[in-house]
């Protein structure tokens, strides 16, 4: 049985992924009692798995370059970049959406001034407004994008919305929904050939429990 290396996004997706792993009998003991460890042996009679925790934006890189055979990461991260791997499964967890949000008085389709849009996801925002044939100025920021319209940096924001509580608490509202997003499983292209049986087993077993 060949070893399969899995790169998992730290944080919220990590906890939900553990539940899925347990459901298909992957050994998660080390992962649940991890301390400061970053690499975990999840081997048992059914699987030979090594798992490591990384930041969301790094999951794709580990998978693309073959340091990981499989990755679990949000669709938001996949949409923002352009890397080479197979996207094989929608895990139906970590569900939220991309949306345009602004102060209630803002109208996206009114006025002739070029709109300023603050976002952590410039590529996603650019493509969205391109399809709407709107010429906007994108302002990339890494912190709380909700501040943009409040302090006058931007007219609106493009960001991930889960419950909408953060928007409401800061006096903002969703103007338009862009798309639904969720966690996805990605696979290194070479691994799909060299470790096909092991990878397909994991994909199929997870597919069964998330239906």
Swiss-Prot record:
A Pfam family the protein falls into: HisG
Catalytic activity annotation: 1-(5-phospho-beta-D-ribosyl)-ATP + diphosphate = 5-phospho-alpha-D-ribose 1-diphosphate + ATP
Stored SUPFAM superfamilies: Periplasmic binding protein-like II
CDD domains reported in the protein's UniProt record: PBP2_HisGs
The entry's keywords: Amino-acid biosynthesis, ATP-binding, Cytoplasm, Glycosyltransferase, Histidine biosynthesis, Nucleotide-binding, Transferase
Quaternary assembly: Heteromultimer composed of HisG and HisZ subunits.
Protein known as: ATP phosphoribosyltransferase
Species this chain originates from: Clostridium botulinum (strain 657 / Type Ba4)
Upper lineage: Bacteria, Bacillati, Bacillota, Clostridia, Eubacteriales
Gene name as annotated: hisG
């Amino acid at each position: 049985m060949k070893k399969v290396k899995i790169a998992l996004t730290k944080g919220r997706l990590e906890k939900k992924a553990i539940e899925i792993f347990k459901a298909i009998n992957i050994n998660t003991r080390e992962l649940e009692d991890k301390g400061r460890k970053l690499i975990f042996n999840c081997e048992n009679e059914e699987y030979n798995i090594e798992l490591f925790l990384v930041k969301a934006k790094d999951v794709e890189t580990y998978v693309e370059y073959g340091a990981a055979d499989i990755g679990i990461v949000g669709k938001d991260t996949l949409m923002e970049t352009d890397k080479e791997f197979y996207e094989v499964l929608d895990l139906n967890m970590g569900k939220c959406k991309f949306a345009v949000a602004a102060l209630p008085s803002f109208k996206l389709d009114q006025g002739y001034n070029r709109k300023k849009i603050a976002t952590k996801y410039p590529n996603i925002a650019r493509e969205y407004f391109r399809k709407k044939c709107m010429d906007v100025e994108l302002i990339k920021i890494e912190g709380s994008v909700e501040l943009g319209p409040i302090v006058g940096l931007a007219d609106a924001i493009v960001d991930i919305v889960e419950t909408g509580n953060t928007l409401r608490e800061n006096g903002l509202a969703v103007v338009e929904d862009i798309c639904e997003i969720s966690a996805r499983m990605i696979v290194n292209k070479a691994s799909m050939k060299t470790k096909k049986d092991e990878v397909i087993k994991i994909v199929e077993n997870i597919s069964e429990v998330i239906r």
